[in-house]
Amino acid sequence: MNKIIILISLFLNFLFGYVVCLNENNQKSQNLIIPTYSIKLKSDGEYLVYSGNDTLSIAQASYTNEMMSIGWGYISITTNPKYNDSLQIEAAGYLEGYLSYEMIWQNWNNMMVNQNANNSFGNDIISWAKENILYMNQQIQLNQNDPYWINVNLVLQQLNGLTNGYSDANQNPDRQLSLMDFILLNMNVEIYDIMNSLKNNSSSFYQQPNNNSFDNNQHCSALIKLTDDLTELYTGHTTWSDYYQMVRMIKSYNFRFSKLVAAKSNTTMFSGYPGVLMSVDDFYMLDSKLVVLETTNGIKDNDSELFKLIKPQSVLTWIRIIVTNRIAHSGKSWCEIFEKENSGTYNNQWMIVDYNKFIKGVRVQDGTLYVFEQLPGYVEYADVTNILRTGYWPSFNVPYFETISNMSGFNYQSSSSDSSSSSGSIAYEQYPRSQIFRRDSNKVYSISDFQAFMRYNDFQNDPLAYGDPGNQISSRFDLITPQNNASAAGGIDSKVTSLELINQFLMIAQSGPTHDQEPPFSWSSENWKNKYPTIGQPDTFDFEWVTFSTTSFGSFPSASNEKNY
């Protein structure tokens, strides 16, 4: 009976849970009363989820699905330190899986229908994943007092709770998901690298993605901008991905573990996806005052010998990022921890902004910005604060370190002189987005300027776009002409924070493709909904910016779409 009451509550919240009003700027906004839930153990050892914020329970959550009103779902989970670490994390996972089970299915369905040609993963991938889990469990048993492996174990326990919560909430036998399904969902962005490693090891299975799918490597734009007067440091990220992946969530985890966990960060807030414990974008705010983000470099040659270095005897990136964010206390320590157990999958340029090192109006201390880049069998990182002191750090899917660039195939010779080329044959400084960052970043003076820049796409008028809507900060590949060359892919969000915001632990985010200079994206236009079947998404993405905290969210005045760079 309790399960039925909770499910009815979730449904009623979807229908009636928000009130539209006018803010002081006469802009429409949503003032939401976010439903709260708690979880405890029953006498039979099973979990019970019930309405209300019971501070004596194992964990409490605020959850609402506002995809149709603001383009985001929202979940915030807090655990009770009176319970042991394993119970806290498993209950937190269960609570998330139970409450967001509908969004989880929508995310899974959209991925399977559009990404995998056979609507399934191959046996080789599943065998690889099982071997990887076996390796981690062995290391957990051998290193029971090591904080690194203690935290790896906590991630696996959270995933197990997530699976069980989903299974108990889901009433549809056609929508059952196993623990292996959740493992595959969480490692999804790493599967292409693993498939390439299996191919190079003469594996019998190698499945090409659906032809509709975006580039195997997720691409993004990121900017870390220091104001001229040293009064503010902005950090922003725009995710590039397939539009079918736009079932989105902002998540906040406040886990209060024992000293054995050695956590330097108890609270994290990030943009993410239902059923996935990492950000994927990636964009994290930590209460240690670190902000962690990345753009994907990848490996240019699918036949590269580097793929042979990918082995199951490692820890995948999706787990390493959670562990590292929790136990790192600085940019340098973050790099040292993240280097451990390098899987060589999801090879990114990571940026770690340490707001503890930024003294407003005075100086930017060494260690404010570290950059970390990864390949199979090799990593490189450095303190690049000196570059930030010149005004900004850009990130646009091209390696910064020369060795990484050479090894991953970005610096091969080419006769092409077209600066619009995305082949990787041009200099780091000559990529279109690199030139846009250089031209426009010093025109950012306010948070509104920064928001507008992270959403910028004026490809028809920007000479650096070379007529290509993909050569902008927030790409719109759906606007490519002729239409038969277009794809429903591009920038799907933007997130920004700053010293002022992180001191309040606030993130400002906008969901969906940019619609400042360009028209909003609609599934009903250009026959997109037939080419990319999706569920759980609105037809049109024309949402405003929203400010998120660890307990609530609300409107934020939109960045001016009249700003021209």
Swiss-Prot record:
It holds the Pfam family Phospholip_B. The keyword DNA repair does not apply. GO terms for cellular component: extracellular region. Glycans are attached at N53, N84, N118, N200, N201, N211, N266, N302, N406, N485. GO terms for biological process: phosphatidylethanolamine catabolic process; phosphatidylinositol catabolic process; phospholipid catabolic process. One of its GO terms (molecular function) is phospholipase activity. Residues 1-21 form the signal peptide. The keyword Glycoprotein applies. It is an enzyme of class 3 (hydrolase). Its EC number is 3.1.1.-. It is found in: Secreted. Keywords: Glycoprotein, Hydrolase, Lipid degradation, Lipid metabolism, Secreted, Signal. Belongs to the phospholipase B-like family. Probable phospholipase. This is Phospholipase B-like protein C. The gene is plbC.
